[in-house]
């Protein structure tokens, strides 16, 4: 396609931003290797559908569904989100003065009334064992810092000759949750506390930790402390950081200390938020690589809001066309794919969105997904395919009327003779040599693979 003048300026601006970060827009291919989070993690998180009050039975039901229907397609993580230690957690928000279950060392443990298998000090190990028995991996959410309750009780820190009140920073608090104080990492015993909680969770069999209230604003010392604690356990645990948006200037630090980091605030089923995420995700184009992935947040698809912190029980308010646009962007951007809906409630269409192996291959096998072109409400993304010379192509119309988007293969660095395959429809597309005009409906998208003809 002939890229309009304004779009070329936008593209050059992106190149200038990337150069300032020493991150090439079109970096050389990185060979995928067997490493932790070698491809974007794929899984389920309880937040979008069950908010603060998810139960063991609900987690097990989603794990069973994933094992039966999604594991063959690469989905593997089951993650319990916030407030799992609070017996009286409720829908619709956080309790202002929560009572949290914790052990004698000020470490949070599951609320037995919600997670019965955790009784008698077993923690999440029985639930993690169940998840592992299904061929899946188990994760949990933590808040930055130490429970305020532990500070009030001045509990000892396991493995150190200090107590909670000596390491807490009472001026370092979360703006939206009253559970924790931050840790003053310069004080003796602060690292020991993080070591103790990660050691406990590793003993339960945790494979994934979502650390919250740690990225915006960024708390580098506590991120590094959690990363260090994970390394000490010797267990491969994926570390996810929230909430976003992360700062682009922190990219190297994030790569060194985490496996995924949020690039947006909480993402819900609103077109306005999806439109914004095209910009936020686009900033990080080409940055993801094995071991470290910019994260567009959970996928609010299927049935959500059942007993959530926000909203009511509903099927995703995204239209079917918009739901496909979400999956197309997350796939070509190589964002982690963390499904937010209640899996057993999935309808046929929702299941089709997350079991199309040709689409999922863009996310799992592609590399350096980046915005190639932006003009008005048109967006074009490209990513490098795993096959020599192949590219993935995403076309998006964020506007309110149908648009034609014309692309010429040589502008993508491809020869005129290419096979164009529609990945959603799983069929090759016939058309003139060297070019194609994509007719894209309002809020819609297309996802394709271009392979040089032999």
Region locations from a protein language model:
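Aromatic-lined carbohydrate-binding/catalytic grooves of carbohydrate-active enzymes
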Residues: 67-202, 206-213, 220
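Glycan-recognition surfaces
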Residues: 166-172, 184-186, 192, 196, ...
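Structural recognition of the beta-strand scaffold that forms the well-ordered cores
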Residues: 41-46, 76-81, 137-142, 202, ...
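Catalytic cores of secreted or luminal carbohydrate-active enzymes
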Residues: 325-373
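Bacterial N-terminal signal peptides
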Residues: 10-22
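Carbohydrate-binding surface patches
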Residues: 324, 330-333, 338-340, 374-414
């Amino acid at each position: 396609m002939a890229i309009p003048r304004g779009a070329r300026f936008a593209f050059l601006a992106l190149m200038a931003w990337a150069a300032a970060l020493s991150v090439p827009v079109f970096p050389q291919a990185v060979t995928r290797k067997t490493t932790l989070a070698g491809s974007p993690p794929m899984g389920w998180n309880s937040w979008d559908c069950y908010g603060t009050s998810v139960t063991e039975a609900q987690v097990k039901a989603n794990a069973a569904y994933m094992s039966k229907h999604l594991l063959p397609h690469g989905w593997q993580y089951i993650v319990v989100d916030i407030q799992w230690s609070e017996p009286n957690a409720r829908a619709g928000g956080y309790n202002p003065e929560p009572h949290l279950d914790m052990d004698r060392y000020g470490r949070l443990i599951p609320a037995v009334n919600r997670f019965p298998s955790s009784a008698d000090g077993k923690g999440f190990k029985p639930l993690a064992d169940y998840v592992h028995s299904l061929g899946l991996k188990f994760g949990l959410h933590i808040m930055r810092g130490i429970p305020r309750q532990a500070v009030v009780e001045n509990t000892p820190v396991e493995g150190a000759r200090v107590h909670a009140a000596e390491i807490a920073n009472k001026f370092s608090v979360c703006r939206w949750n009253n559970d924790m104080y931050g840790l003053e990492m310069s004080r003796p015993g602060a690292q020991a506390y993080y070591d103790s909680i990660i050691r406990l969770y590793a003993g339960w069999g945790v494979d994934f930790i979502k650390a919250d209230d740690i990225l915006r604003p960024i708390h580098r010392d506590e991120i590094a402390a959690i990363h260090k604690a994970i390394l000490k356990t010797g267990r491969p645990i994926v570390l996810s950081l929230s909430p976003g948006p992360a700062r682009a200037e922190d990219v190297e630090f994030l790569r060194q200390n985490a496996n995924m980091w949020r690039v947006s605030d909480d993402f819900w089923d609103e077109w306005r938020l999806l439109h914004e995420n095209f910009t936020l995700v686009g900033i990080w184009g080409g940055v993801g690589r094995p071991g470290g992935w910019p994260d567009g947040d959970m996928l609010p698809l299927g049935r959500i809001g059942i007993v959530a912190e926000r909203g009511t029980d509903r099927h995703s308010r995204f239209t079917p066309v918009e739901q496909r646009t979400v999956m197309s962007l997350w796939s070509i951007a190589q964002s982690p794919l963390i499904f937010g809906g209640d899996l057993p409630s999935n309808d046929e269409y929702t299941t089709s969105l997350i079991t199309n192996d040709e689409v999922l291959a863009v996310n799992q096998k592609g590399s350096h997904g980046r915005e190639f072109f932006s003009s008005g409400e048109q967006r074009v993304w490209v990513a490098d395919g795993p096959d020599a010379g192949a590219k993935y192509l995403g076309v998006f119309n964020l506007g309110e009327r149908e648009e034609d988007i014309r692309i010429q293969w040589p502008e993508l660095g491809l020869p005129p003779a290419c096979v164009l395959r529609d990945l959603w429809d799983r069929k090759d597309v016939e058309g003139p040599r060297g070019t194609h005009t994509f007719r894209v409906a309002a809020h819609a998208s297309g996802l394709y693979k271009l392979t040089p003809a032999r």
